[in-house]
Regions:
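Cofactor-binding beta-sheet edge motifs in enzyme active sites
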Residues: 1-261
Length: 261
């Protein structure tokens, strides 16, 4: 409700965790500072003697739950809300010179895809995919692996099935699920192996993590490349012409061209 709290940035550009995570961390640290100051004053100790660990707070020789301290802070009229703010540092770009640092860091990945094609129909199937993705120090490995799988499947659709077709009057003909084919669960490879390259991000991102939203989409280029390699087996040494998206029709045309060459 933006009438009550600041409006957040959109979840886009693979920057959701980077921006919102760092802003939330900044807010949490300020609230912790207030709670620490309150506890230290109440118990007559230095702020350095206040420790937060595993849901408990140690204040000198005393120990209490985090919930109890929060309750005491509220009763003591300590503000327990804060609006954190974060903007990506160290980025700049000179449009005229085309130089600068447009991104704080880069995410890397590698993928291998195995496909099978039917040279008589153009139908094809992705049999196996192996992915190694650089997620930095992953915030949630299970979620990150799911994001990588989803991004890769989306990329498969981009490169193999999702085709924009316009009629003679320039109107989009593939405008609905009945005409615009997106990947479904049965299109996912039966053997799908994803591992995370667990190495802390050198940039100061939230807990040294890295983006995993959109980067995996590009790894689906491995599927397109595997289709081209499969077509090469029809006529080794000959040039393969295959436009994307590599629909069954286009794979069939490429196969027929190789057979007749």
């Amino acid at each position: 409700n933006t009438a009550k709290v600041p409006n957040a940035s959109p979840t886009a550009a693979s920057a959701g965790s980077d921006l919102n995570g760092m802003a939330a961390q900044a807010a949490a640290r300020e609230i912790k500072r207030r709670m620490t100051a309150f506890a230290a004053e109440a118990h007559g100790v230095a702020p350095e003697a206040v420790r937060f660990r595993n849901g408990e707070v140690s204040v000198g020789d005393a120990t209490m739950s985090f919930a109890d301290l929060a309750k005491k802070c509220r009763q003591g009229r300590v503000q327990l809300s804060h609006a954190g703010f974060y903007k990506t540092p160290e980025i700049h770009w000179d449009r005229a010179a085309r130089r600068g640092k447009p991104f704080l860091y880069y995410a890397y990945g590698a993928a291998c895809a195995e496909v099978a094609i039917d040279s008589l129909t153009g139908e094809n199937k992705v049999l196996r995919v192996d992915i190694r993705h650089d997620a930095g120090r992953s915030l949630n490995p299970a979620l990150d692996i799911g994001q990588i799988e989803g991004g890769f499947i989306q990329g498969m659709g981009w490169l193999t099935t999702e085709e924009l077709v316009f009629d003679a009057r320039g109107r989009l003909a593939t405008h609905a699920p009945s005409t615009y084919k997106i990947p479904v669960s049965s299109d996912a490879p039966k053997d799908f192996r994803v591992t995370l390259h667990d190495e802390p991000n050198r940039a100061n991102a939230i807990h040294r993590s890295k983006a995993v939203g959109e980067p995996p989409l590009m790894l689906a280029i491995s599927v397109y490349s595997a289709l081209v390699d499969a077509l090469h087996s029809i006529a080794p040494g000959r040039q393969v012409s295959l436009d994307a998206p590599a629909t069954p029709e286009r794979v069939l045309r490429a196969a027929e061209a190789l057979k007749s060459a």
